[in-house]
């Protein structure tokens, strides 16, 4: 059995998230249906994460298995793209070692969230528009607090089936790109709804409704009700997933 990683991106506007579910089309379902047509048999895939409804991915990685070596992976990617809807794109397909796992072997995942205080008719579907001014300097100070903790229960969706709420934050901060402010966060793993809850709470700091110490208290409370409201998913992007080099065989 051979295993392959699919590198892909998608606009999540028209999908009910990544994972297959009964109440609407998902990205995973779209790809599996296209693979089934090409391979003439069901081909399940496993993604690096489970983005929520409306959330996008500049880069998502998923794995699938096939009994024999696939000769022309470039051609397979091209055929997949012909079958997939316009809001999903396969970038490439690469062979990996048989035990490689798109979800469990990922060493980091990076998300970006886009915020603006100015109205723009061209990016309103991909950026979160907020009225008034925000103190991004204070928000960046609050970001530093994230590195002092690993238990992020306060930013986790309630009643999930995860075994632990521990995550190791590797990077977190706000940068400005013209009229848009971008929150970038990288960690070994993320909880369900975690990034949107963190951004929502940081915005409370930016509005002056929550102090830096108050932000720390939210984390220490380990209570989702203490954190801010989750921001909408339409401005959230998964932008990178990393893996150990040993998962990728060296070509002769």
Swiss-Prot record:
The subunit structure is: Homodimer.
Active site (UniProt): 52 (nucleophile)
Question: Species name for this entry?
Answer: Parabacteroides distasonis (strain ATCC 8503 / DSM 20701 / CIP 104284 / JCM 5825 / NCTC 11152)
Q: List the disulfide bonds.
A: none
What is the stated purpose of this protein? Answer: Formation of pseudouridine at positions 38, 39 and 40 in the anticodon stem and loop of transfer RNAs.
Keyword set, alphabetical order: Isomerase, tRNA processing
| Gene designation per UniProt | truA
| EC id | 5.4.99.12
**Where is substrate annotated to bind?**
111
Q: Please give the Gene3D superfamilies that the UniProt record associates with this protein.
A: Pseudouridine synthase I, catalytic domain, C-terminal subdomain, Pseudouridine synthase I, catalytic domain, N-terminal subdomain
The record, for HAMAP family, names: TruA
Please state what the protein is called.
tRNA pseudouridine synthase A
The family annotation for this protein states: Belongs to the tRNA pseudouridine synthase TruA family.
Give GO terms: molecular function aspect only: RNA binding; tRNA pseudouridine(38-40) synthase activity
